[in-house]
């Protein structure tokens, strides 16, 4: 039996002899690499924390002791050591275990995560609850150096310094988030790495002075009384110390015994402690070591080479956005681009290489990204904020307060709108129509295909006010022709005209509606098909025209129904003297779990076959 096969629960690692820890780490890495090569997943970040996770399981006792993983994509070894190795065949698949910690999956998952920079706040709250309940367990928050660029982490550190009981923060420093880190914190942590000799210097000086007969001990005490001044000169973690958080490190994150010693020291302190751990993202798999950004989140790949098994034959929406933005920027020098640590994922990396002075990666800081874009707009530029739908949620007040109240011309390029699949409820982009649609001055569009995205971007930069374009993950739809026409404000596109029933589809659901139309036509029920284009404002003029010859309206959107464009259509219909039937095809008032997008569509009833069944049942066709 392999060492890994002996791990069936959180206590089992403590039965593995210390001499075999290195071999166990190698087995875990081989398992992770082979699994991700077959099924995909977050690879590089997980390869970097194998020894760190082992050291925590050897030093602490989950689930009694609480380990909170910031973001959570690096929790695979944690899931293995807590007894879920047998479930990895279903990792990130519908009905299987999640790729992130989930409290309802295991008692060892202390707190659900998925977004960045939350772990210190959550850990601080859990440590405070522990103290109020008179309990003694440890609380450990594991946060990466990338997540430490998020403002919420500093808000939590500011409060953590007041702790009078033990709370451990593990800073997993691999010099990257998804792409390379940016900003002052990244430079600060780099300076710490280069001054790692401080702790050794401190120990050596104290030992040497103590050996001086008669004067040594008094000199050491004298130095201790002036330690703050000395620290200002030597301590690499003084930023944290000034916040009241004791700094320990930096420590080799791949040396289990050293990690265990520093965890033992950290646990003895009745205050907040930050343990600075240096790890290598992608460790143990050469392609991931060379290109950790490319192996952050991967699909299936060839084990020997790391080359993806599936090659893209057609561009995805992110590619279309990237190419079009560069073309538009060549025509207008006022166009600038902002990303919150997602240059590759949002397609802005190429723009940054072409126009480095007009490109701004602000780190994991969506609030700052939005307001800095507002400042750029107020200063006469034409900014685009490229961001995932689920991450723009984090900057909601800035969209409302800093952009829309002032009616500033900021373009929001909202990638991953709609279902995204395997990353689950924290990443599904199914709320943006709802949280943006309620804001005055905001205009929202969604393209039906790749060519329309190009035209909508061109329109957005000429519009002159806050505007959002939402588009899905994955291959760009190329159906319904390459017909191009200039986008007109608030105007939909009538694709096929029939009578009686009209399908009103938005964005990614236009292609689905086209399949529905074809199937219903074959059943003798031809339908009108409208590409709505604008979720806000809806084309009330076209709807009024259709109401003269149509009785049934069907809205289709890849967003939750509440607050979506379908309810806007229902409100319009209710104001008409003629009684109209409005059917909504949208997502339920629930979080959508992880799984393949096609499986999720069927499960949620928004695939073409499910929609046809709903309409046949309702209208007795």
Task: Please annotate each region the language model reported.
Residues 1-81, 245-260, 269, 273-279:
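N-terminal amphipathic, basic-rich helices that act as targeting or association modules
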Residues 4, 175-321:
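Long, well-ordered, tryptophan-enriched scaffold segments
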Residues 42-163, 317, 334-335, 339-340, ...:
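Cofactor-binding active-site loop characterized by glycine-rich and histidine/acidic residues
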Residues 66, 271, 279-393, 398-408, ...:
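Non-catalytic terminal/interface segments that mediate subunit docking, oligomerization
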Residues 219-287, 409-414, 433-482, 608-621:
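Structural signature of the thiamine diphosphate
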Residues 261-264, 296-297, 306, 316-331, ...:
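Glycine-/acidic-rich phosphate or pyrophosphate-binding loops and their flanking alpha/beta elements
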Residues 300-304, 308-311, 421-423, 443, ...:
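Peripheral docking tails and interdomain loops at the edges
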Residues 361-362, 514-546:
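Generic long, charged, amphipathic alpha-helical segments
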């Amino acid at each position: 039996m392999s060492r890994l096969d002996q791990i069936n629960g959180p206590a089992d690692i403590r039965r593995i002899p210390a001499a075999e820890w290195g071999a166990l780490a190698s087995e875990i890495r081989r398992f992770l690499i082979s699994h991700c090569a077959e099924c995909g997943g977050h690879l590089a970040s997980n390869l970097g924390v194998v020894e760190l996770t082992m050291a925590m399981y050897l030093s602490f006792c989950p689930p009694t002791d609480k380990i909170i993983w910031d973001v959570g994509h690096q929790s695979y070894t944690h899931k293995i050591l807590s007894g879920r190795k047998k479930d990895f065949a279903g990792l990130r698949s519908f009905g299987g275990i999640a790729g992130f910690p989930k409290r309802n999956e295991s008692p060892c998952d202390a707190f659900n995560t998925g977004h960045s920079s939350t772990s210190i706040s959550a850990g601080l709250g859990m440590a405070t609850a522990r103290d109020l309940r008179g309990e003694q367990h440890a609380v450990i928050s594991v946060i990466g150096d990338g997540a430490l660029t998020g403002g919420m982490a500093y808000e939590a550190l500011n409060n953590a310094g007041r702790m009078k009981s033990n709370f451990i923060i593990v800073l997993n420093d691999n010099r990257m988030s998804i792409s390379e880190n940016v900003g002052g914190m990244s430079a600060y942590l780099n300076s710490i790495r280069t001054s790692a000799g401080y702790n050794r210097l401190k120990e050596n000086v104290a030992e040497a002075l103590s050996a001086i007969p008669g004067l040594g001990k008094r000199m050491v005490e004298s130095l201790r009384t002036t330690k703050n001044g000395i620290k200002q000169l030597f301590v690499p973690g003084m930023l944290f110390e000034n916040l009241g958080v004791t700094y320990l490190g930096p420590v080799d994150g791949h040396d289990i015994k050293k990690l265990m010693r520093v965890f033992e020291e950290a646990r003895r302190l009745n205050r907040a402690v930050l343990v600075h751990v240096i790890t290598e993202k992608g460790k143990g798999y050469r392609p991931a070591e060379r290109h950790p950004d490319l192996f952050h989140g991967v699909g299936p790949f060839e084990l020997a080479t790391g080359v993806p098994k599936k090659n893209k034959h057609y561009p995805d929406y992110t590619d279309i956005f990237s190419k079009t933005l560069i073309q538009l920027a060549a025509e207008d020098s006022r166009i600038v681009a902002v990303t919150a640590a997602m240059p590759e994922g949002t397609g802005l990396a190429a723009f940054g290489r072409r126009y480095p002075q007009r490109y701004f990666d602000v780190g994991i800081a969506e609030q700052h990204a939005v307001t800095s874009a507002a400042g750029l707009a107020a200063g006469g530029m034409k900014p685009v904020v490229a961001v995932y739908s689920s991450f723009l949620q984090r900057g909601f007040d800035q969209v409302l307060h800093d952009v829309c109240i002032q009616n500033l011309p900021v373009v929001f390029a909202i990638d991953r709108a709609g279902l995204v699949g395997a990353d689950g409820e924290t990443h599904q982009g199914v709320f943006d129509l709802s949280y943006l649609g309620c804001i005055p001055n905001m205009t929202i569009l969604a393209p039906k295909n790749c060519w329309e995205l190009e035209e909508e971007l061109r329109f957005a930069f000429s519009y002159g006010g806050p505007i959002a374009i939402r588009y899905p993950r994955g291959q760009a739809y190329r159906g319904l022709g390459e017909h191009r026409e200039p986008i007109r404000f608030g105007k939909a596109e009538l694709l096929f005209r029939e009578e009686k029933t009209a399908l009103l589809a938005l964005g990614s659901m236009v292609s689905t509606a086209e399949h529905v139309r074809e199937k219903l036509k074959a059943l003798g029920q031809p339908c009108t098909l409208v590409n709505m284009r604008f979720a806000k404002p809806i084309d009330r003029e076209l709807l009024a025209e259709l109401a003269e010859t149509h009785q049934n309206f069907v809205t289709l959107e890849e967003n939750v129904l509440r607050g979506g464009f379908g309810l806007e259509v229902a409100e319009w219909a209710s104001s008409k003297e003629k009684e109209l039937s409005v059917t909504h095809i949208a997502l339920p008032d629930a979080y959508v779990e992880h799984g393949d997008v096609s499986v999720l569509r069927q499960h949620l009833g928004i695939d073409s076959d499910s929609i046809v069944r709903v309409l046949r049942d309702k209208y007795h066709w």
